[in-house]
Every structure is written in structure tokens, then in C-alpha cells.
Regions:
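Conserved PLP-dependent catalytic core of the aminotransferase class-I/II
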Residues: 215
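Short helix-coil junctions and helix-kink-helix linkers
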Residues: 224-226
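Short amphipathic alpha-helix in the helical subdomain of ABC transporter nucleotide-binding domains
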Residues: 231-234
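Catalytic cores of RNA-modifying enzymes
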Residues: 1-210, 239, 243, 250, ...
């Protein structure tokens, strides 16, 4: 397809096109798309996945940033009345407004260099999807799915919105051009109810940034520095929340962070 249209993948856009048909079908299966679903596809590329989504979904909004690919994409999906192709940068668009209403499904092949920014943009939108199925670097997917003891800012920033899981590993050879690392299909099932209101969510992110500022240090020390209080005061507040002051940020689960936000809300 690229050769026929005299096009080359753009390194500056992190373009690696998923070309393995079996993998494409597995991604659609992981998304559990039905005829009642509205799908927002990010990074539609050459339309291989777009066509499969269009065959299953009620409607598909396919977003592609590369102006060169849009005419090709429109040609590939021209037989599908339920697919609309849009040219633009998803980071400059409102995903929820594109989808039209809550409960839509996001399917995306995300460039490695802006993975975190795109995930955050999709999760933080006011009009929430039901789930996201993302093709991302395997190592990043594993970090997002980490459990207490190995948690990170990235993992907590996703897990506060939904439950992540890895649906499958995608070998580098499934892409063109072939990247240096393997990828994974990451599925995020959004919680039906948010864990925090808007103010609490801001406090949560402020708190975890404090906790992970020096993640090898004990929480009594990182929170003392972040809240500008003494170590003894920080230890007392942690103990009041049922958290051992000598623990480190990566060992706390989401419920413990929520309890800690409630305990420290007067200082966050």
C-alpha cells in the first residue's frame, strides 16, 4: 500500500504500521466491539484495523495525524458507510466530543514517544469511554499493570481511572517497519464510578508526585519534604491513615493512597 502511493513511514511520527492480520483480528476481539458500539480509533494509519472495526461496530471515527495517509485511508474504507475519517492530532482534539456520548470504545496504535501523553489525554476526558484497547510498547504495558511493590507514577495514573490488563504480546515482526522492541495489547476497563471527585483527584496526583519524588526514601521523609512538615509530623499523619511511615511509595495500593488523601486533604 505504501509503495503503491509512493509513501514512506515517518520516523518523526513514530510510524510503525501493524500488518499482521491475525494480530489485527485479536485486537478487535479484545475490544469486544458489537454493532451497538461507537469506536474512536486513534492512529488509523492505512486502515487495516479500521476496516475490521467497521465490520463489527455501529460507527467508527478514525483519527489520523498524517495528512499524506488520509486520502489512502478514505480510499480503503470507502465501502463502509459507518466509518468517518478525520485528520488531526488527538492531543489537540476532544475524544469525548468526537465519540458523542459516554461508553464508547477507544482502539489505538500509539507511537512510543508520546504514549503517556495520549493515555492521559484519553483517560482524563470528561466524557469517559467504557474501555480502551491500546497497542503500546510491551515494557510500558507491563509497568502500567504493575502491582503494589512495583507501582510507579505511570501505573497509578492509569489505575486510578480503570483496571488495566495485557490481552496479548505482539512481536516486532508484526509491524512495518519492524521496531526494535515487542509491543503489547493493553486493555483498560474504566471504573463505572470514579474513585475521586475533581478536587480529590488533584490532591491524589499531588500526593503521589510527592511520594515518588524520591521513591527509594521512606514516605515519612518524602511527605515531610513535600508538605513542609517535620518527619515526626509526617509519621503521625501516615500512622493515622493506617500506613507504616517506613514504607515506600511503590508499596502502597490504590485504596491506601485514597485513605491517605482523605487524611492529608487539609494540607494538599
Amino acid at each position: 500500500m505504501l509503495r503503491r502511493h509512493h509513501l514512506d513511514p515517518r520516523k518523526g511520527l513514530g510510524q510503525n504500521f501493524l500488518v499482521d492480520h491475525n494480530t489485527l483480528k485479536k485486537i478487535v476481539g479484545s475490544a469486544e466491539v458489537t454493532a451497538q458500539d461507537h469506536v474512536l480509533e486513534v492512529g488509523a494509519g492505512l486502515g487495516s484495523l479500521t476496516r475490521l472495526l467497521g465490520a463489527s461496530a455501529g460507527s467508527v471515527k478514525a483519527v489520523e495525524i498524517d495528512q499524506r495517509l488520509v486520502p489512502v485511508l478514505r480510499e480503503v474504507v470507502k465501502g463502509f458507510a459507518n466509518i468517518e475519517v478525520l485528520q488531526g492530532d488527538i492531543l489537540e482534539l476532544d475524544p469525548g466530543r468526537l465519540a458523542g456520548k459516554p461508553g464508547y470504545i477507544v482502539v489505538a496504535n500509539i507511537p512510543y514517544y508520546i504514549t503517556s501523553a495520549i493515555i492521559r489525554h484519553l483517560l482524563e476526558n470528561e466524557i469517559k469511554p467504557a474501555r480502551l484497547v491500546l497497542t503500546i510498547q510491551q515494557e510500558v504495558a507491563e509497568r502500567i499493570c504493575a502491582e503494589p511493590g512495583d507501582l510507579s507514577l505511570l501505573a497509578l495514573s492509569v489505575q486510578v481511572y480503570g483496571k488495566p490488563s495485557i490481552s496479548g504480546i505482539i512481536p516486532a515482526e508484526a509491524f512495518y517497519p519492524v521496531p526494535k522492541v515487542d509491543s503489547a495489547t493493553l486493555r483498560i476497563d474504566m471504573y463505572p464510578q470514579t474513585l475521586f471527585n475533581d478536587k480529590q483527584r488533584e490532591q491524589f496526583f499531588r500526593l503521589i508526585h510527592m511520594g515518588f519524588a524520591q521513591k527509594r526514601k521512606m514516605l515519612r521523609n518524602t511527605l515531610a519534604a513535600g508538605l513542609h512538615i517535620t518527619g515526626d509530623e509526617a509519621a503521625a499523619r501516615l500512622s493515622a491513615a493506617g500506613v507504616d511511615p517506613d514504607r515506600r511509595a511503590q508499596t502502597l495500593n490504590l485504596a491506601e493512597w485514597k485513605t491517605l488523601v482523605n487524611e492529608l486533604q487539609d494540607q494538599l
